[in-house]
Amino acid sequence: FGGAVNMTTASIGTDFSGEASLSYGSYNTNKQAVRISSGLLGDHWVVDARLTHIGSDGYIDRGATDLKSYMFQTGYYNGRTIVKLLSFGGKAKTYLTYNGVTKDEMKYNGRRYNSGGMYRTEDGRYHTIYNSNDGYPEWQKVDYYDDETDNYLQINNQIVVSHRFNDRWALN
């Protein structure tokens, strides 16, 4: 199965512009973004760029995120024809928070408890671990692997060509 969606996210800016934004929230959640556009150059060309960073310590123990993304495009516009070279992508580092938590685990270990990356050791800290044989909680020493993360890097490059023949027909 496959498909395509023809979508315009922003109209062509005729004037130079830029924007910067900063935000901050709970659990050290933060976002920084900067965008710049050349405006129309020589009646035909536009260059746009954007950089974004999002980070958070996360609500769940060891649930931090570190996300970076970029977008760069240059486009040629000539009446009914558009040719754009576009590159976008990002890098993501997310700590593992996939495991669910039972009511008893929350009762003994708190709402933010995360068993991801946990292993038993003699030198670790105490957490309630459930014995699979009898179902009763028992205290055991555990520790957590450092950098138990998912790491992604994605780079996308596209050439987009569009020509409008008339008000009813266009080719992309």
Question: What kind of feature is each model-predicted range?
Answer:
Residues 24-55, 60-99, 104-108, 157-166:
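Transmembrane beta-barrel wall of Gram-negative outer-membrane proteins
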Residues 1-4, 34-42, 52, 123-128, ...:
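Short, functional N-terminal and low-complexity linear motifs
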